[in-house]
A protein has these predicted regions:
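His/Asp/Glu-enriched, well-ordered alpha-helical/loop segment
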Residues: 200-228, 275, 296-297, 301-302, ...
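A glycine-rich helix N-cap at a beta->alpha junction
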Residues: 112-126
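Divalent metal-coordination and catalytic microenvironments
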Residues: 9, 24, 29, 50, ...
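C-terminal cap of metal-dependent C-N hydrolases
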Residues: 318-321, 375-430
Length: 430
């Protein structure tokens, strides 16, 4: 393997608190050195001057649809979309067909990922069998097989009794349960945030209290069991405060937020364009302000995409009948740089920490740092690259993004996985 020398970029490594202009030398798949005026005979030189060199981005909440719905996305297409967006590690949710609820499936999917993906894919196992909320899945066996966390994402079916049993079982393993926080009984058939906007559009709403109730319940159960609850795609101001208060009293609770929940409100909903239909739904400016404050003060630990591609014919249905979600891996960094970093709302260093070191630390991944000896997963960002989102250039099989046509500023221009360049200037190279 040829050595790679990244010269003269601004190196941001939250794990070591490094934020300075430096060189990064990659040899034999690891970070060999970080410092000034590095040299290596025969190394490939990449001029990173004016760019930002960071640990490879990590996304702990994606839906790659494999097995069972490969027409929407599979490990090959999804991993290429991830690499194009600057990601070197992602975790994929278990709501597939069949549901990932056995050790055998975890093992087979890990093997499949090694064969088909251009970056690292980690597997999240289901909490309950077939995600039906009735009987615990093979949790211990899936831990042994390598499941990185557990989730019935997309469902809020487990009763308090079943969920408490899962917390009790997983607490000794220090594995998180990632919960989709909406009380199903309150959001059935709802397609957007409940409020004045939904009433004006004539679209049945999903009340925000459904999220608040769910977050409160799951925090209390995790606190009782001494277990780790991870609140998925938080979107409510009250939920942010509940997490903040729980952390203050020592509860093992972490949480995530998506770029769309940080930058879009219910006012973006257009009944003729289902790309904005997501669960939980887009909320209000008040909620965005609370989430941004939570991101700044550490209440919200990480940013994820909830990358959820669907077939075009599915998303072209009437708003209330279209499935929820859209692809986000190729637009996330640009949206966050444009809307938060370049507007002065969020320091770049904080954003990088929430997209690299934090998820690696919380989910115990050997990733998220540029320390010497670490796996050479590196992303180079051009903070001033101005580009227009074009679905025809997506690597994902889903094209239904609300950001299509948007001009963004900031983009990953180089993605390195285990020392190999897998993306350069938007082109997958392997």
């Amino acid at each position: 393997m040829r050595a790679l020398l990244l010269k003269g970029g601004r190196v941001i490594d939250p794990a070591s608190k490094r934020n300075e202009v430096a060189d990064v030398l990659v040899e034999d798949g690891v970070i060999r050195a970080v410092g000034a005026n590095l040299a290596a005979d025969g190394a490939e030189i990449y001029d990173a001057a004016g760019k930002v060199v960071v640990p490879g981005l990590i996304d702990m909440h994606t839906h790659f649809r494999e097995p069972g719905q490969e027409a929407k996305e599979d490990f090959a297409s999804g991993s290429r979309a991830a690499a194009a967006g600057g990601y070197t590690t992602i975790a994929t949710m278990p709501n597939t067909r069949p549901v990932v609820d056995t050790a055998a499936l975890v093992t087979s999917l890990q093997k499949r990922a090694e064969e088909a993906a251009v970056m690292h894919i980690r597997i999240i196992g289901a909490v309950t069998k077939n995600q039906e909320g009735k009987e615990l899945a093979e949790l211990g066996d899936m831990v042994e097989a390598g499941a990185v966390a557990f989730s019935d994402d997309g469902h809020f079916d487990p009763s308090a009794k079943v969920l408490l049993s899962a917390y009790d079982y997983l607490a000794p393993f220090d594995k998180a349960i990632i919960n989709h926080e909406e009380d199903t009984s309150l959001v059935e058939e709802g397609a957007m945030n409940e409020g004045h906007r939904s009433a004006m559009l004539g679209i049945k709403g999903r009340p925000i209290v459904a999220e608040d109730i769910a977050v409160a319940r799951d925090i209390m159960l995790a606190e009782y069991a001494g277990a780790h609850v991870h609140v998925a795609h938080i979107s409510s101001a009250r939920a942010v405060q509940l997490v903040r208060e729980a952390k203050a009293r020592g509860v093992h609770v972490t949480t995530e937020v998506t770029p769309h929940h940080l930058t879009m409100t219910e006012d973006c909903v257009d009944p003729t364009d289902s790309s904005t239909k997501v669960n939980p739904p887009l909320r209000t400016e008040k909620d965005i302000a609370a989430m941004l404050a939570g991101l700044l003060d550490g209440t919200i630990d990480m940013v994820v995409t909830d990358h959820s591609p669907h077939a075009r014919e599915e998303k072209d249905r009437e708003y209330i009948y279209a499935p929820s979600g859209f692809p986000g891996l190729e637009t996330a960094l640009g949206v966050l740089m444009t809307e938060l970093v370049h507007t002065g709302k969020l320091p770049l260093e904080t954003l990088i920490e929430r997209m690299t070191y934090a998820p690696a630390r919380i989910f115990h991944l050997d990733a998220g740092t540029l320390r010497e000896g670490a796996p050479a997963d590196v992303t180079v960002i051009d903070p001033d690259c101005v580009w227009t989102v074009d679905e025809k250039k997506f690597y994902t099989r889903g094209s239904h993004s609300p950001f299509v046509g948007r001009e963004l500023r900031g983009k990953a221009v180089l993605t390195v996985v285990d020392g190999n360049i897998v993306m350069k200037d938007g082109v997958i190279t392997i």
